[in-house]
Amino acid sequence: MSITAERKQALIKEYATKEGDTGSPEVQVAVLSERIANLTEHFKGHKNDNHSRRGLLKLVSQRRRLLDYVKGIDQTRYQALIGRLGLRR
């Protein structure tokens, strides 16, 4: 199941660096993490859904690239972001 518009707006509001910020890497990583979590739950009941599994792998790769970008810009921002999201890296 995809994420609702209300949940996406809540994530944007929570992770935005300034008012109206929807494209910062922090916001993008937060939205991707929510989508990844939803797909992970989906796979608990649909183990053989290989088409969605490919989409999940693409999302994970995109999130990894964004996290690497943030890490290259500012190490403290990176550490704060993975701490807030509860990611292990």
Curated annotation (Swiss-Prot):
It holds the Pfam family Ribosomal_S15. GO terms for molecular function: rRNA binding; structural constituent of ribosome. Signal peptide: none annotated. Keywords: Ribonucleoprotein, Ribosomal protein, RNA-binding, rRNA-binding. One of its GO terms (biological process) is translation. InterPro entries: Ribosomal_uS15 (IPR000589), Ribosomal_uS15_bac-type (IPR005290), uS15_NS1_RNA-bd_sf (IPR009068). One of its GO terms (cellular component) is cytosolic small ribosomal subunit. SUPFAM superfamilies: S15/NS1 RNA-binding domain. One of the primary rRNA binding proteins, it binds directly to 16S rRNA where it helps nucleate assembly of the platform of the 30S subunit by binding and bridging several RNA helices of the 16S rRNA. Part of the 30S ribosomal subunit. Forms a bridge to the 50S subunit in the 70S ribosome, contacting the 23S rRNA. NCBIfam families: S15_bact. Belongs to the universal ribosomal protein uS15 family. This is Small ribosomal subunit protein uS15. It comes from Brucella anthropi (strain ATCC 49188 / DSM 6882 / CCUG 24695 / JCM 21032 / LMG 3331 / NBRC 15819 / NCTC 12168 / Alc 37) (Ochrobactrum anthropi). The lineage of its organism: Bacteria, Pseudomonadati, Pseudomonadota, Alphaproteobacteria, Hyphomicrobiales.
